[in-house]
Amino acid sequence: MDKIEQLQGIIDQSQRIVFFGGAGVSTESNIPDFRSSDGIYSLKLGRHFTAEQLVSRTMFERYPEDFFDFYKKYLVYPDAKPNLAHDYLASLEKTGKLKAIVTQNIDSLHEMAGSQKVLKLHGSADRNYCLGCHRFYDLTAFLELEGPVPYCLDCGKVVKPDVTLYEEALDMDVFSRAAQVIHQADLLIIGGTSLVVYPAASLINYFSGSNLVVINKSSTPQDSQADLVIEGKIGEVFSKLRQ
């Protein structure tokens, strides 16, 4: 039995599936993976800032022009479309087996594919709020704000994306709900993540179910604990499963 058949068998016998995903889920939608060799972290920025520094709270407050220049160029992809991974997970949710998607990504491709139960650990690029009057801007309205720094049309204060920056804490309500669904799962599929970003990666420790599956292009710290490890692109793997 090959690994795809094994995965199909595990899915068939599971009733409470949770998918935990990272940047690798969206790379097949042409959104770069932060930590792959050709990802954002390896870009030559031509200045003395790392990518982590550029998307930190400190950079947002002290150098907002640099922050927003980097953010809009490398973290926001308004034309991206769901890929095979997003489509498969949406179809699996419709069967009633998939109870939740826990994602580290800030795009909304899971929702665009039709998924309803999505827990976004690092926030959403589709939500943007004025720091003064709290006016809401969706992604389109946010990108239409003129100038190197987006200022609110009502009060003139800075509009901040509702995403978790480096040096900021995660939304503990979302984190707690993610921990709960992972704890209740009988199958946890980890896909497209190197499991090195904390505290998000620590959520895996809440899993106590029957089967742990890892699907990733490179090895992860959880491989030795997994019941099944498949090396490859997640969309390609899911495309071989029964829809």
Predicted regions and their residues:
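Conserved catalytic core of sirtuin-type NAD+-dependent deacylases
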Residues: 1-243
